[in-house]
Swiss-Prot record:
Gene, per the UniProt record: phnC2
Enzyme class: translocase
SMART domains referenced in this protein's UniProt entry, alphabetically: AAA
Summary of the function given for this chain in its UniProt record: Part of the ABC transporter complex PhnCDE involved in phosphonates import. Responsible for energy coupling to the transport system.
Keyword Secreted included in the entry's annotation: no
Name of this chain's protein: Phosphonates import ATP-binding protein PhnC 2
Keywords attached to this entry: ATP-binding, Cell inner membrane, Cell membrane, Membrane, Nucleotide-binding, Phosphonate transport, Translocase, Transport
Cellular localization per UniProt: Cell inner membrane
Pfam families: ABC_tran
A single GO molecular function term of this UniProt record: ATP hydrolysis activity
Residue span, ABC transporter domain: 5-253
Record's subunit section: The complex is composed of two ATP-binding proteins (PhnC), two transmembrane proteins (PhnE) and a solute-binding protein (PhnD).
Amino acid sequence: MSAVIRVDSLNKTFARKQALFNLRLEIQAGEMVALIGASGSGKSTLLRHVAGLARCDRDNGGSIDVLGRRLQASGRLSGEVRRLRADIGYIFQQFNLVNRLSVLDNVLLGFLGRMPRWRGSLGLFSAEQKRQALEALARVGLADFAGQRASTLSGGQQQRVAIARALTQKAEVILADEPIASLDPESARKVMDILADINRHDGKTVVVTLHQVDYALRYCPRAVALKGGRILFDGSSEYLSEGFLNELYGAEGDTPLLFSDRARRGAESQPELTLARA
């Protein structure tokens, strides 16, 4: 089966400091994959390259294909990048909504990649597009907020609006960069539940960067662990051992963040997660 995402020998250097080292990765259609690792490990940098938001090195930079089409190679984006981006939904950590617009108008922006630019610039959305946008908001539990300004919503609600926008975009691949990093545990669970539902019921490929490993274990069957710009683990999440995770994140600093959800809530509403032993 052809990979939906294929990363081949990807290298990236910032100001003479290499951030990604010869990364190779294939993700198949319908997978839900977590990219995990400490801050600065390269997981967000990798995701931005897969989205076409960053370019690999010009010399020996490698290549990235998405949905069977070349996205970029050797520091150059493909001429098809605009059409490819229409098939790639990107969810940012800080929501990336237009605060002065209504919730509904923000969701309607998901249609821009699939309509003439002049119509989009004038905000000429059809009645059918508005119906679909309201349907997407209903799916994330926010239909009643359609007329409110985006700035009035909580962080968790804004992130769900961003997911609704990806639904109207009709993206085949959804990339989410630390979508729950700034959210409280209840909001984080709602966001991850929605992403998992999109993966299971719509068959969309979902790749999400996560800092808290308990969410990766709970929601993502496959995990890819990065450290220092290199892939150290790629396989079933159930085989992530405590010893490996301590090595990945370090014995101090990042380690307390790994299971912050369970630490804050206790285990009364979720089954205990057991890590595989090395």
